[in-house]
Amino acid sequence: MSRYGLQKLYINGAYTDSTSGDTFDAVNPANGECIAQLQAANAQDVDKAVAAAKQGQPVWAAMTAMERSRILRRAVDILRDRNDELAAIETADTGKPLSETRSVDIVTGADVLEYYAGLIPALEGQQIPLRGSAFVYTRREPLGVVAGIGAWNYPIQIALWKSAPALAAGNAMIFKPSEVTSLTALKLAEIYTEAGLPAGVFNVLTGSGDQVGQMLTEHPGIAKVSFTGGIASGKKVMANAAGSTLKDVTMELGGKSPLIIFADVDLDKAADIAMMANFYSSGQVCTNGTRVFVPQALQAAFEQKIVERVKRIHIGDPSDERVNFGPLVSFQHRDSVMRYIDSGKREGATLLIGGCSLTEGALAHGAYVAPTVFTHCRDDMQIVREEIFGPVMSILSYQSEEEVIRRANDTEYGLAAGVVTQDLNRAHRVIHQLQAGICWINTWGESAPEMPVGGYKHSGVGRENGISTLEHYTQIKSIQVELGSFNSVF
């Protein structure tokens, strides 16, 4: 029997058997063990979830703002009380170190839910005077039933990022987690129900993106889709959403982000920032700054500091709290990352450290890839142009500010960018010219609930987090009121 047993779908406030009974395995990438069997939803299950959501959403929307706020705050409290339990599940399902999942994944997700719970009473319309006897007022009304489709790298955090503003605005959500990492989304559904969310307001359908995800994007009963994933999948989501019922979409589609280091920096600080921008969560972060631009005069010294730090990484069993670098999320993804590493070698990049899968001792049965650093990279190399989503840093040298800005922007992506410098004028001057939606100066990676996150160009549509996201889960109704006489032309 697997550790977490059979996991059913979560529809209408309760665990529900799938129509087909088909299942798939959840695998711990640290050791290859099956930790759960998950039921796979089909079209009938999607219809059931939509019907449940349509029934529950008006009940939820009819509650006062303070009532909805209290229920979501209660869910925040439960999340924090169960932090360690949820972190252990997340670590087993994703391979992320327990030191990460305990301190980041549930914590930051709960923070976002608390943020939106506090904003609910502030969601309001306007009153617009027209003339003495007439005025217009507006209402922000929920969209109805919306869908969230998550990625595998931050399962519960993404589920909370998508559900928090949707629920706060009075919508119901059907959430499809990645089939690779589905367990904590189901636990979140339990928590919402325990907190008092009406049945049907948050449903979880497990299964493949090609099937369940497509059904959700095409379903006529769904008003909006929020998707996190790759560009190719995002294009399908947008096409399906537009081709069915002109659904609204929000999409975060990854990146190939530049981190620009200038010559005036403290090189130790710059190296620390580059390490976090590349190797946190084993490099499986959409905003990672994997194109590290360094002044040519500092390149050798910078490389030395990076190699020193890579050698200090503690790789191992992610359930060991001393470990800060675990396996990749799956064996399939490990193989994909290794193909990119092999490409870097073939195309002539200089390998400084790593460059291999790790198969010795306790790591033999896991999906481990060594932290890898290439230097003397060119802008046309595959490892520089394509999103790898793994622990692979590419170091590129440059000679002038104008040159590095041009090269940093020479990509179809535009999710994130960063600048490390002690010159405040230069920092803002350069950041303002970088084509990216999320930018950091002298830091990397933090995304507070108040901070809108999303990309330029092919990196996405719309934003998550921040006040504006809450508004995007509503539709504006305008009402004109006439207090005086009405004059007809007929």
UniProtKB/Swiss-Prot annotation:
- So where does K(+) 2 get bound? 246, 457, 460
Q: What is its EC number?
A: 1.2.1.8
Site description Seems to be a necessary countercharge to the potassium cations, residues in chain:
248
Q: Which residues bind K(+) 1?
A: 93, 180
Residues bearing the modification Cysteine sulfenic acid (-SOH) = 286
What cofactor does this protein call for? K(+)
Q: What molecular function terms (GO) are annotated for this protein? A: betaine-aldehyde dehydrogenase (NAD+) activity; metal ion binding
Catalytic function, reaction form: betaine aldehyde + NAD(+) + H2O = glycine betaine + NADH + 2 H(+)
PANTHER family documented for this protein:
ALDEHYDE DEHYDROGENASE-RELATED
Q: How does it assemble?
A: Dimer of dimers.
Q: Give a short account of what the protein does.
A: Involved in the biosynthesis of the osmoprotectant glycine betaine. Catalyzes the irreversible oxidation of betaine aldehyde to the corresponding acid.
- The name this protein carries in UniProt is Betaine aldehyde dehydrogenase
Name of the gene this protein is made from: betB
